[in-house]
């Protein structure tokens, strides 16, 4: 008997999530993982490392609650938003019985987490306008425990319509939990739906420090929800999920100075995003530029394979989405500082008109 035969059936059949780092590649301009273009220095004190950390570091919880405009008992800190996704599925879904609903094309970890937990997946594709199909989702509420929506959506960059979300939350009361993934919300903060937590106990919002806060390397995420939901998740989360050095860095990032740095970074990246979007729309090798509410732009090219190969040859690593339904010939470009965006445009301007 092989070791593989000892593994759970769902794990043997599982195709792991193809993260940017797993896919890899060789280059010097990395624009494939929606990371911030620059790290910032933080200080760490090591005199507490002999002790286990707090399960939920108070300084981080209180800091994020103040930043997000919620009460501290509505916040759970986790190892990235990915752990928050998995915690929600493990907490609310029975393996082999329950299902989640996703709206592809969207972030892949919703499905991977469900598969790993032995939970079924209902796919309700986005509409032609790249919005959730609200009536179709409402019709499936009796079949699912959790509905995952990404706003801004990765990879298309679209925001979830607020009116449609409110109507769905009303219909889902006491039936299903609606999860809104706001990993990129700092790039369009007025579009946040956190304010709806006060009205809907079945709403959950997930957040992260990986994008606008430039802290992808520390894996720190947040769940914002009703106190009842948070209490349930707290039963399931590991006893010491946040290492003390991570908590120290997160607390500094959430300080007044840290928030100011984040907002300055977001303003600069949004500026670069507007500039490259304008430039992209004028290029003959570009067929469509998608919505741009995150720190990335999805672009449909005349021939994405040729563009991807040319970028790779130039040492520029992007993320290919051309195999995803409805995203034929599409590549996602992470927004960086001007020199990186100029490098991308230089390659595209050299592409033949008749690709």
From Swiss-Prot:
GO molecular function: histidinol-phosphate transaminase activity; pyridoxal phosphate binding
GO terms classed as biological process: L-histidine biosynthetic process
Keywords: Amino-acid biosynthesis, Aminotransferase, Histidine biosynthesis, Pyridoxal phosphate, Transferase
Keyword Amino-acid biosynthesis in annotation: yes
EC number(s) from the headed UniProt entry: 2.6.1.9
Residue list for modification N6-(pyridoxal phosphate)lysine: 211
Chain segments annotated as coiled-coil in the UniProt record: none
Cofactor: pyridoxal 5'-phosphate
Alphabetized Gene3D superfamilies for the sequence: Aspartate Aminotransferase, domain 1, Type I PLP-dependent aspartate aminotransferase-like (Major domain)
One Pfam family matching this protein: Aminotran_1_2
Pathway: Amino-acid biosynthesis; L-histidine biosynthesis; L-histidine from 5-phospho-alpha-D-ribose 1-diphosphate: step 7/9
Keyword Signal belongs to the record: no
InterPro entries on file: Aminotrans_II_pyridoxalP_BS, Aminotransferase_I/II_large, HisP_aminotrans, PyrdxlP-dep_Trfase, PyrdxlP-dep_Trfase_major, PyrdxlP-dep_Trfase_small
Family according to the record: Belongs to the class-II pyridoxal-phosphate-dependent aminotransferase family. Histidinol-phosphate aminotransferase subfamily.
Subunit structure comment from the entry: Homodimer.
NCBIfam families assigned to the protein according to its UniProt record, in alphabetical order: hisC
Identification of the protein by name: Histidinol-phosphate aminotransferase
């Amino acid at each position: 008997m092989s070791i593989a035969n000892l593994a759970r059936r769902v794990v043997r059949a599982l195709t792991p999530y193809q993260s940017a780092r797993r896919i890899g590649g060789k280059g010097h301009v990395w624009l494939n993982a929606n990371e911030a273009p620059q790290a910032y220095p933080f200080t760490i004190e090591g005199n507490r490392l002999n002790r286990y950390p707090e399960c939920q570091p108070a300084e981080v919880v209180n800091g994020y609650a103040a930043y997000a405009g919620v009460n501290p008992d509505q916040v759970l800190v986790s190892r990235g938003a990915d752990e928050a996704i998995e915690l929600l599925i493990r907490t609310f879904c029975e393996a082999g019985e329950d299902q989640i609903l996703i709206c592809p094309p969207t972030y892949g970890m919703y499905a991977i987490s469900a598969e790993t937990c032995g939970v079924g997946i209902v796919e309700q594709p986005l509409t032609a306008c790249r919005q959730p199909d609200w009536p179709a989702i409402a019709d499936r509420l009796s079949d699912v425990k959790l509905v995952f929506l990404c706003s801004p959506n990765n990879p298309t960059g679209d925001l979830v319509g607020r009116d449609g979300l409110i109507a769905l939350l009303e219909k889902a009361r006491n039936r299903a939990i609606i999860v809104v993934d706001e990993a990129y919300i700092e790039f369009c903060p007025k579009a946040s739906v956190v304010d709806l937590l006060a009205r809907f106990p079945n709403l959950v919002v997930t957040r992260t420090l990986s994008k606008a806060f430039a802290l992808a390397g520390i894996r720190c995420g947040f769940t914002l929800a009703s106190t009842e939901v948070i209490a349930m998740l707290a039963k399931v989360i590991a006893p010491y999920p946040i290492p003390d050095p991570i908590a120290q860095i997160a607390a500094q990032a959430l300080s007044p100075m840290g928030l100011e740095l984040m907002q300055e970074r977001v303003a600069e990246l949004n500026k670069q995003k507007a500039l490259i979007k304008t430039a992209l729309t004028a290029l003959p090798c570009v067929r469509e530029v998608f919505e741009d509410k995150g720190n990335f732009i999805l672009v449909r090219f005349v021939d994405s394979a040729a563009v991807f190969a040319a970028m790779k040859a130039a040492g520029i690593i992007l993320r290919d989405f051309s195999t995803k339904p409805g995203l034929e010939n599409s590549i996602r470009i992470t927004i960086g500082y001007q020199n990186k965006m100029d490098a991308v445009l230089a390659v595209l301007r050299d592409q033949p008109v008749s690709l």
